[in-house]
Amino acid sequence: MAINAQEISALIKKQIENFQPNFDVTETGVVTYIGDGIARARGLDNAMSGELLEFSNGTFGMAQNLESNDVGIIILGDFSTIREGDEVKRTGKIMEVPVGEALIGRVVNPLGQPVDGLGDIETTGFRPVETPAPGVMQRKSVFEPLQTGLKAIDALVPIGRGQRELIIGDRQTGKTSVAIDAILNQKGQDMICIYVAIGQKESTVRTQVETLRRYGALDYTIVVTASASQPSPLLFIAPYAGVAMAEEFMYNGKHVLIVYDDLSKQAVAYRELSLLLRRPPGREAYPGDVFYLHSRLLERSAKVSDDLGGGSITALPFIETQAGDISAYIATNVISITDGQIFLQEDLFNSGIRPAIDAGSSVSRVGGSAQIKAMKRVAGTLRLDLASYRELEAFTQFGSDLDAATQAKLNRGRRTVEILKQPLHKPLPVEKQVVILYALTHGFLDDVPVDDILAFEEALYDYFDAHYDHLFETIRTTKDLPQEAELDAAIQAFKAQSNFK
């Protein structure tokens, strides 16, 4: 058989033309320093800020400081096996977390990996942890109420869907209990809840998860935990991971409640990282961009326009104060970013007023427009009445003689304080809150002994459930009060057959 040189030449040329080089080109560097969750590496000249980098042991890090001769990296995981001289390579991606329905009911770390021992999470969706907040024209005004189930909040400092409401107070004043009760009250409200535990003890997180499970709230809740024993980078990244998971639902037209427990610990973790990365310290040794740390997180909570699905993220960030000082650096930063604050006071907590909400220092800047009409009508003057009672109470400690009008105000004030108390993990539907506050503001409790107020309240609910359920139904469906004459008659009928005189 004759060999045709031209044919062979043409064949070789064709092969060369069709050749696709299959090189895997990655930029690699060398670790020059490692310790305390921080690494420095040389040779990553083209690394991007926030880019995910992979170490030779499979651990990932995030590029933070891009300097002329090296890159400062925060390590997102175990750094005990990383050594100086180890290889680190660029991935070309920024950090993402898994998102979607599969995460609901699970406990995950800030990387989206399950830590509850219930197996892998099957999801294909991912979102970057750092994304721009919705712009002005992409937002809508807050107008839908978010009922927490706590009378003191829903009446005095109402929260709307899409709002950021700070919960601030000393340690052990019931901040977490307020948020957990708010989550429990979202059952059947078509809300997804995300609880982000930052720097908490693992035993504490376990207790909260068990509480959510016991009351059936884990069916619509994701728990993101970065416990106190984990490296600072994970504490720093946890809130951003939580809000990335929330954004997936918001941009699909759903409503989300996200709790950050607490942002003081995130600020401390960020200060630690910044000092280790040798960034210049500012006030209280926090870096200059600590305001931006929290503003870029909380601005991602919003009520978005109908064009984007009309979903919302409502944020309840926590700040822990020292000796009730709400004028501290981080506290004032977050107060200025949020749409209001609920201030929990240690003195009130210790005197048995729980939730220990200080009505004078607490405010909701946008929630009033989201409050239902019935609640507006019964709770309109409640805040002023309470403030006036506190003032009179302080004055009467001097033992002055009181006229009848002042005595009546004091009596009403004592009953108001009693009515606003609420047992732990027993959130109330809004229609029950409206009825008891109506009874209070219309003088039906003025002749009930203060010690019997809570028993009166329970008995009133039971009586209405049995005989006047249609009044509850009216408030539920119309969001307004039923006929006042009918409501008055129902409460009078209850008082006539009860032992509360």
Swiss-Prot record:
Indicate how the chain sits in the lipid bilayer: Peripheral membrane protein
Listed A to Z, the keywords are:
ATP synthesis, ATP-binding, Cell membrane, CF(1), Hydrogen ion transport, Ion transport, Membrane, Nucleotide-binding, Translocase, Transport
Q: Which GO terms describe its molecular function?
A: ADP binding; ATP binding; proton-transporting ATP synthase activity, rotational mechanism
Under the heading InterPro entries, the entry gives: ATP_synth_asu-like_sf, ATP_synth_asu_C, ATP_synth_asu_C_sf, ATP_synth_F1_a_nt-bd_dom, ATP_synth_F1_asu, ATPase_F1/V1/A1_a/bsu_N, ATPase_F1/V1/A1_a/bsu_N_sf, ATPase_F1/V1/A1_a/bsu_nucl-bd
As recorded in UniProt, its EC number(s) are 7.1.2.2
Subunit structure, per the record? F-type ATPases have 2 components, CF(1) - the catalytic core - and CF(0) - the membrane proton channel. CF(1) has five subunits: alpha(3), beta(3), gamma(1), delta(1), epsilon(1). CF(0) has three main subunits: a(1), b(2) and c(9-12). The alpha and beta chains form an alternating ring which encloses part of the gamma chain. CF(1) is attached to CF(0) by a central stalk formed by the gamma and epsilon chains, while a peripheral stalk is formed by the delta and b chains.
Name recorded for this polypeptide: ATP synthase subunit alpha
Gene behind this protein? atpA
